[in-house]
Regions:
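A general structural signal for short secondary-structure junctions and capping/turn motifs
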Residues: 5-7, 56-59, 68-70, 85, ...
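Active-site-adjacent "gating/activation" loops or surface patches in catalytic cores
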Residues: 114-159
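Signal-transmission/dimerization alpha-helices at domain junctions
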Residues: 38, 42, 55, 59, ...
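PAS-family sensory modules
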Residues: 12-45, 136-147, 202, 207, ...
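Signal-transducing coiled-coil/dimerization helices and immediately adjacent hinge/linker segments
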Residues: 40-66, 70-71, 209-274
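Alpha-helix initiation and N-capping motif
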Residues: 28-32, 100-101, 109-113, 121, ...
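Sensory/regulatory domains in signal-transduction proteins
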Residues: 1-27, 60-63, 76-77, 81, ...
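GAF sensory/regulatory domain recognition
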Residues: 11, 68-129, 262-280
């Protein structure tokens, strides 16, 4: 038996065939229904990402699953991870933007899921001359498309045998990736990949929901803090000293190590802050 996928791009129909696996009979929705219910019960972004890493690893059986978030400068930050006990954790590590260049990110926006079942395998050429009049066949949306040799070498250097990634797209932009690594070659069946893609789409929507809730809660808390400061602010006394006495709750609210205020050459601070000589 074979699993087959079909997509049409630029007027060309592309069929892809792969040997069917024993798990291929299960429908993707049946595989992830329970997982989706668990994700919808999470209350914070951290809990959502931690739970997603654990559940994806349980679904596909890889040695390591990471939630990898792109920062404003293009660098990547591993914000959640589930991995085998014998592996060194990578959570909280950051990687330069050059690890996943802009061109690669555009492909991640086109394809929700990407699988490299064996990093040691040799790519197979495609004879497209007769079908396309000699023009290169665009495999941007192909499931079995080969990947950059540079990326393959990168995975080999990490001692990775197989890799799978699920795109996280929030508001039309690539927010991050669910990156999955296995130390040995590992072929993920088509229905499991479809389940992973569905999970990635729901996860992306859930991120948007949770981030919206967290932003609203933060805004309400900021408003309440500001109202309290204004209500308690003395109508007389030294302005700078009165402001300085309220630096600590402001610093705690934004989770900073310290805060300071500089008015007319006078510096007041709380917690860990820079000396006045560096402010002047």
């Amino acid at each position: 038996l074979w699993d087959a996928t079909l997509h049409v791009y630029a007027g060309t129909a592309i069929y892809e065939f792969e040997p069917a696996q024993q798990s291929s009979a299960a429908a993707p929705l049946d595989l992830v229904r329970g997982i989706l219910q668990e994700l919808q019960q999470t209350k914070s972004l951290r809990e959502l990402c931690d739970q997603t890493a654990y559940l994806v690893r349980r679904l596909i059986g890889f040695d390591r699953v990471m939630v990898y978030r792109f920062l404003e400068d293009g660098a990547g930050h591993v914000i959640a991870e589930s991995c085998a006990e014998e592996l060194d954790p990578l959570v909280n590590l950051r990687y330069p933007a050059s690890d996943i260049p802009k061109q690669a990110r555009e492909l991640y926006k086109r394809n929700w899921i990407r699988l490299i079942c064996d990093v040691q395998a040799s790519p197979c050429p495609i004879d497209f001359s007769s079908a396309s009049g000699g023009a290169p066949l665009d495999l941007s949306y192909s499931t079995l498309r080969s990947v950059s040799p540079v990326h393959i070498e990168y995975l080999r250097n990490m001692k990775v045998g197989a890799s799978m990634s699920i795109s996280i797209i929030v508001g039309g932009e690539l927010w991050g990736l669910i990156a999955c690594h296995h130390m040995k070659p590992n072929f993920v069946a088509a229905n499991l990949r479809a389940a992973g893609e569905l999970l990635g789409q729901v996860f992306s929507l859930q991120i948007q929901t949770v981030e919206g809730i967290e932003a609203y809660v933060t805004m309400r808390a900021a408003r309440a803090l500001l109202d309290r400061i204004v209500a308690e602010f003395p109508v007389d006394g030294d302005l700078i000293e009165n402001l300085a006495q309220r630096l600590e709750p402001l610093s705690a609210f934004i989770n900073s190590d310290g805060a300071g205020i500089w008015i007319d050459g006078i510096w007041r601070s709380t917690g860990l802050s820079i000396p006045m000589t560096e402010v002047a």
